[in-house]
From Swiss-Prot:
Protein name: Small ribosomal subunit protein eS6
Keywords tagged on the record: Cytoplasm, Nucleus, Phosphoprotein, Ribonucleoprotein, Ribosomal protein
Quaternary structure, from the entry: Component of the small ribosomal subunit. Part of the small subunit (SSU) processome, composed of more than 70 proteins and the RNA chaperone small nucleolar RNA (snoRNA) U3.
Record InterPro entries: Ribosomal_eS6, Ribosomal_eS6-like
Length: 246
């Protein structure tokens, strides 16, 4: 079985091949996210504690958190769930995944070191891989360097040099996100002013509409009364003519 170790404190990763089942028994019947002491792997691992992050079986099917079995199941998966990436919007698909319990049929395990032991592991804990990429968000840069709102964040961006295939070396600086600039303030004021003007226009249009509607209703009411009066006068005239003939 291949054991893929990761040590977040140094940023390094390393794989080890372990063929002796006796050493691997300490992982059997353990679940994902469970912490395991790995003293049985050898003297160099004495005192180390790892967390099981996942793994694959011998056919390549991945482990899925929350499936309490050591075998394979077929689940209807959708966007946002692990072990599946949708190809179309709203697409769901039934896929085979392995449960979250480790057994002898696993071919690879992902392990994260949560507690360092007594000795150093070459290529994993003996050196530190420097981070080339720093934070991009303005608030996180301020938090990292303990800056105030009035300090210039652009002077504290973490940059790194990158050599391109043509041999040219350039300094790469990330674009700062959510940075408050005069242009952004002006744009926000413009949008607020536009929104306020739109509300005033809607209010004026609604008032004009209600005024026009009231005028139209009054005209309709007056016309209806006029028709009623005209009909009544015509009816009274016909009655007078009938009585005069008699």
């Amino acid at each position: 079985m291949r054991l893929n170790f990761a040590y977040p404190a140094t940023g390094l990763q390393k794989s080890f091949e372990v063929d002796e089942e006796k050493k691997l028994r300490l992982f059997f019947e353990k679940r994902m996210s469970q912490e395991v002491a790995i003293d049985a792997l050898g003297d160099e691992w004495k005192g180390y504690v790892v967390r099981i992050g996942g793994g694959n079986d011998k056919q390549g099917f991945p482990m899925k958190q929350g499936i309490l079995t050591n075998g394979r199941v077929r689940l209807l998966l959708k966007k946002g769930q692990s072990c599946y990436r949708e190809r179309k919007n709203g697409e769901r698909k039934r896929k085979s995944v392995r449960g979250c319990i480790v057994d002898a049929n696993m071919s690879a395990l992902s392990l994260v070191i949560v507690k360092k032991g007594d000795g150093e592991i070459e290529g994993l804990t003996d050196s530190v891989l420097p981070r080339k990429l720093g934070p991009k968000r303005a608030s996180k840069i301020r938090k990292l360097f303990n800056l105030t709102k009035h300090d210039d964040v652009t002077k504290y961006v973490i940059t790194h040099d990158k050599t391109f295939p043509d041999g040219v070396t350039k300094t790469i600086a990330p674009k700062i996100q959510r940075l408050i600039t005069p242009a952004r303030i002006a744009r926000k004021k413009y949008l607020l002013r536009q929104k306020r003007n739109q509300k005033i226009k809607m209010r004026d249009d609604a008032a004009a509409y209600h005024k026009l509607l009231a005028k139209y209703s009054k005209e309709e009411h007056d016309a209806k009364i006029a028709r009623r009066r005209s009909s009544a006068s015509h009816h009274s005239e016909s009655e007078v003519k009938k009585t005069s003939k008699k």
